[in-house]
UniProtKB/Swiss-Prot annotation:
Keyword Protease included in the entry's annotation: yes
Designated name of the protein: Ubiquitin carboxyl-terminal hydrolase MINDY-3
Enzyme Commission code(s) on record: 3.4.19.12
GO BP term, pick one: apoptotic process
Subunit structure: Interacts with COPS5.
Keyword Nucleotide-binding in annotation: no
Sites bearing Phosphoserine, chain numbering: S125
Active site: C51 (nucleophile), H287 (proton acceptor)
Originating organism: Bos taurus
Length: 445
């Protein structure tokens, strides 16, 4: 087994997990990208864990299906179209991961039937025809096991996107086999570069896959969503006790919302909360699903008041709803507002008449951005995807359709429900109400 293989295993699985535990978690991750029989473009997830890869792939697949295709019946997805969609999606994610790595791309595959001595492992062998490598799901996981599988994988490198796209398409059967999800994950990690990932992760000793529960880390989710394996979901970088904590640096194509924000464990920044396309990964405590819509008006450019709210909140990392008055000048400069000292003092007195030394978000927005509501439609059709059969209505992996209504602060609330999915979506739309076409609300778990 090569040093690169060992580094990869430590990055993903950690160094101290027992072999038995590794095999248990490993088996939960050994599945391919398999489409649902009930919904042509929906990927199925067999056990808990691999949603950290499957959900982002599903989200980017939907982006391509909904916004790069002219077809009207988007839910009608024949096999040849699925093949093309999946391969293009995998390439897009690999391209995003490779942006910091001088345009070099990697694919990891496994060599069935080879001995450890015969296998180059991750020695970086040059690109070769796929006929030299067998991609079959016939060999059971139990026959391989954790150690054996990692002794039978190899890396191939590509210098151009065109070569990569041809290889990904050529190896379509590999992505659907029993190891497809892991092989794609390893391809992303090696395309990004192990050292690059370690430089972005807050604690490089923490594995990307939890060795006890098998869940993917936030760094892994962020890597697949943005191409950067940072550990946080806020906008930009922050300093804490002299330590630099990396966040998200630009608007993501696909967004991220989490129930953890509704529970006040974290605060997702605008770059993930307001993505380029109306598709969001939705996180519960243990699982990832996808919430999406076809209405691009949902991701219209920020209104000035929304930009002001975002900038104000970067100076309020604790989400208190206020900042010290000493920071008012910084906020106003960041928003290109008048910021000469006399005017700043005038505004401090107006916004803090009691002299408490704080500036509240509400009065600040009302002063500089009055009568500016949130942009976007008030009512829109939405869909929810959950890859686990047992979590779906009638145990069929299908998109659940619904109608979302976004109300103003002063509107009487319809109060349709108080479900986890609604609480999660309220972190993006505080006054959202949801009406689903099924008898029960979609599950986040």
């Amino acid at each position: 087994m090569s040093e690169l293989t060992k580094e990869l295993m430590e990055l993903v699985w950690g160094t101290n997990s027992s072999p038995g535990l590794s095999d248990t978690i490993f088996c939960r991750w050994t599945q391919g990208f398999v489409f649902s029989e009930s919904e042509g473009s929906a990927l199925e997830q067999f056990e808990g864990g691999p949603c950290a890869v499957i959900a982002p792939v599903q989200a980017f697949l939907l982006k391509k299906l909904l916004f790069s295709s002219e077809k009207s019946s988007w839910r009608d997805c024949p096999e040849e179209e699925r093949k093309e969609l999946l391969c293009h999606t995998l390439c897009d994610i690999l391209e995003s991961a490779g942006c910091d790595n001088s345009g070099s791309y990697c694919l990891v595959s496994w060599l069935r039937g080879k001995t450890t001595e015969e296998t180059a492992s991750l020695s970086g062998s040059p690109a070769q025809s796929s006929c030299q490598v067998e991609h079959s799901s016939a060999l059971a996981v139990e026959e391989l096991g954790f150690e054996r599988f990692h002794a039978l994988i190899q890396k191939r490198s590509f210098r151009s996107l065109a070569e990569l796209r041809d290889a990904v398409l050529d190896q379509y059967s590999m992505w659907g086999n029993k190891f497809g999800v892991l092989l794609f994950l390893y391809s992303v990690l090696l395309t990004k570069g192990i050292e690059n990932i370690k430089n972005e992760i807050e604690d490089s000793s923490e594995p990307l896959i939890d060795p006890v529960y098998g869940h993917g880390s936030q760094s892994l989710i962020n890597l697949l969503l943005t191409g950067h394996a940072v550990s946080n979901v806020w906008d930009g970088d922050r300093e804490c006790s002299g330590m630099k904590l990396l966040g998200i640096h630009e608007q993501a194509a696909v967004g991220f919302l989490t129930l953890m924000e509704a529970l006040r464990y974290c605060k997702v920044g605008s770059y993930l909360k307001s993505p380029k396309f109306p598709i969001w990964i939705v996180g519960s405590e243990t699982h990832l699903t996808v919430f999406f819509a076809k209405d691009m008006a949902l991701v219209a450019p920020e209104a000035p008041s929304e930009q002001a709210r975002r900038v104000f909140q970067t100076y309020d990392p604790e989400d208190n709803g206020f900042i010290p008055d000493s920071l008012l000048e910084d906020v106003m400069k960041a928003l290109d507002l008048v910021s000469d000292p006399e005017y700043i003092n005038l505004m401090k007195n107006k916004l803090d008449p009691e002299g408490l030394g704080i500036i509240l978000l509400g009065p600040f927005l009302q002063e500089f951005f009055p009568d500016q509501g949130s942009s976007g439609p008030e009512s829109f059709t939405v869909y929810h995807y959950n890859g686990l059969k047992q979590s779906n209505y009638n145990e069929k992996v299908m998109y659940v359709e619904g109608t979302a209504v976004v109300m103003g602060f002063e509107d009487p609330l319809l109060q349709t429900d108080d479900t986890p999915i609604k609480r999660c979506l309220q972190t993006k739309w505080p006054y959202i109400e949801l009406l689903w076409t099924t008898d029960r609300s979609p599950s986040l778990n």
